[in-house]
Amino acid sequence: MASDAPWHQGPRACFDLETTGRDPQQARIVTASVVLVSPAGEVQQEWEWLADPGIEIPEEAAAVHGVSTERARAEGRPVAEVTAELGEVLAGFWRSGVPVLAFNAAYDLTVLTRETERHGLPAPEPFPVLDPFVLNKQVHRYRRGKRTLGALCEEYGVVLDAAHTSAADALATERLAAALADRFAELRQPAAALHEAQIGWAAEQAASLQEYFRRKDPAAVVDGTWPVHPRP
């Protein structure tokens, strides 16, 4: 059940994936982490998974998150099992009205949705979702420089240990979102209302970025659908 209180005054979960590639329509899950945080910001519970994605992990991806094909095959569980368990954990939060925070949520949730489809699993209904990537763009529209999780954590004084592990990135996402809410009153909304606002904000941000890209490439397209991209 959704709460009418500002989201940062209640419990929240944070979520991150490390995968086989950058294209969310094709990427497979390699690691996944979910962290439940109390209203006071204390870690209450953690879930972590290592999956065998069923395909080779490209060297470029392994260099980012540190999981090789060999390790995933030796230590990981079948990706269908991981996807099912991850989906159930997230769905439980959403059924209870607990917001799930994810940095660049449209990537992670699109990867998860495509994985559920590949394995004939139910896709959880992602609501409410809070995305510090979208939130930061809304309050700092003309900020120059990178908007990676690492760059924004540095800007807002958030400690990011072991970057590009799903557990560290998930918790840093929550800390970043809390820092944004502390600084910007317009982000201190109930989770459901902020979710709905982000749908429009993400679309506007994508349209602006697409306009910029089209100065050099008239055919450039930026998908502003949020929090899950449709199939192409």
Segments the model singles out, each with a brief description of its role:
Residues 33, 50-53, 133:
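Residues at the C-termini of beta-strands that transition into short coil/loop
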Residues 1-30, 37-45, 67-232:
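DEDD superfamily 3′-5′ metal-dependent exonuclease/proofreading module
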Residues 45-65:
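Short, surface-exposed acidic-centric catalytic microdomains
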